[in-house]
From Swiss-Prot:
It is found in: Plastid, Chloroplast, Plastoglobule. SUPFAM superfamilies: NAD(P)-linked oxidoreductase. InterPro entries: AKR, Aldo-Keto_reductase, Aldo/ket_reductase_CS, NADP_OxRdtase_dom, NADP_OxRdtase_dom_sf. It comes from Arabidopsis thaliana. Residues 1-31 form a transit peptide. The active site is at residue 108. GO terms for cellular component: chloroplast; chloroplast envelope; chloroplast thylakoid membrane; extracellular region; plastoglobule. This is Uncharacterized oxidoreductase At1g06690, chloroplastic. The keyword Hydrolase does not apply.
Length: 377
């Protein structure tokens, strides 16, 4: 009796006659059907970009997973099974909609941040479960090293990475980043990144929250070993443009280092969800105050008007504005499937140059909130 085989065609696969991507997909499909496996929704190479000067290609938008398992800043200080299921939905929906780049860190939801469950552990579990369902599934993972004062030397970086790999249930990650510059010993940390590359533990390396000078120093130190600095992950959004004002964005563009933008929708402030009458809860409420949200309304109103022309949400407009800056990969944080699907709809189309300029002009009238202090060191 013939065995019935189930497979799912890719959600966003672009078929072009004679293309390498089409041939590759067909070969994978034939192998999967022959083996009885399900086929993961494919992500076309056209939807990916190279990360800096590395050989690593990732999707033009990623997903930040800081909130997964966290109870020190997000989730109203509580983590439960309902939020766990929602996070799993965010992961699967991201992949189903063409986003395969996930950014985590060893301090997210871990003992360092007093979280209940490690974000790395959850991401590793979700990847394992995805591959059990779709053996050929591919996921790009970025994680980070915490430059804690008691960590010294290059060995601390490799040791921390191996611990992260254990939590992620992986033998290597795609991108390993220094989460912030240390109080001392940064040369050793950079040497540790190089060692991790040479040991095959990571495909590409980057930094996070690095100023222009620190970025240039890191770039040159790694360059001496023939290793490209792939990325600098910083706080960057329509209403927080410090990377432009401090020279970080220009330096990234000059050196060919990809700028990965965290808080690209200003922790929800640019979604239109929050108003002076309904500010965010928890620590965010002390950052995005009623006074700030009042000043933000004219910009949000215009974002909504522009969004109506494209049938896009304010969130999608804000993210697309960042992509329009060039050499930028936004990584909004997704807590559930609905958010993940919305984020995926932020790419694959473009605002006009006039709209990009108009939004910048309106945003310039708003005094930005305080960022991460090390950005200016």
């Amino acid at each position: 009796m013939a065995m019935a085989t189930h497979f799912t065609f890719p959600f966003n696969y672009v078929v072009s006659e004679g293309s390498h991507g089409r041939r590759s997909f067909v070969r994978k499909l034939v192998r999967a059907v022959a083996s009885g496996d399900s086929v993961a929704p494919a992500i076309s190479e056209e939807s990916k970009v190279k990360l800096g000067g590395s050989d690593l290609k990732v999707t033009k938008l990623g997903i930040g997973v800081w909130s997964w398992g966290d109870n020190s800043y997000w989730n109203d200080f509580q983590w439960d099974d309902r939020k766990l299921k929602a996070a799993k939905g965010a992961f699967d929906t991201s992949l189903d909609n063409g986003i395969d780049f996930f950014d985590t860190a060893e301090v997210y939801g871990s003992k360092f941040s007093l979280g209940a469950i490690s974000s790395e552990t959850l991401l590793g579990r979700f990847i394992r479960e995805r591959k059990e369902r779709y053996p050929g599934a591919e996921v790009s993972v970025a994680t980070k090293f915490a430059a804690l004062p008691w960590r010294f030397g290059r060995e601390s970086v490799v040791t921390a990475l191996k611990d992260s790999l254990s939590r992620l249930e992986l033998s290597s990650v795609d991108l390993y980043q220094l989460h912030w510059p240390g109080l001392w010993g940064n040369e050793g940390y950079l040497d540790g990144l190089g060692d991790a590359v040479e040991q095959g533990l990571v495909k590409a390396v980057g930094v996070s929250n690095y100023s222009e000078k620190r970025l240039r120093d890191a770039y040159e130190r790694l360059k001496k070993r023939g290793i490209p600095l792939a990325s600098n992950q910083v706080n960057y959004s329509l209403i927080y443009r410090a990377p432009e004002q401090t020279g970080v964005k220009a330096a990234c563009d000059e050196l060919g280092v990809t700028l990965i933008a965290y808080s690209p929708i200003a922790q929800g402030a640019l979604t239109g969800k929050y108003t002076p009458e309904n500010p965010p809860s928890g620590p965010r409420g002390r950052i995005y105050t009623r006074e700030f949200l009042t000043k933000l309304q004219p910009l949000l109103n215009r974002i909504k008007q522009i969004g109506e022309n494209y049938s896009k949400t304010p969130t999608q407009i804000a993210l697309n504005w960042l992509v329009a800056q060039g050499n930028v990969i936004p990584i909004p944080g997704a807590k559930n499937a609905e958010q993940a699907k919305e984020f995926a709809g932020a790419i694959g189309w473009s605002l006009t140059d006039n709209e990009v300029s108009e939004l910048r002009s309106l945003a310039s009238e708003i005094k930005p909130v305080v960022g991460f202090p090390v950005e200016y060191l």
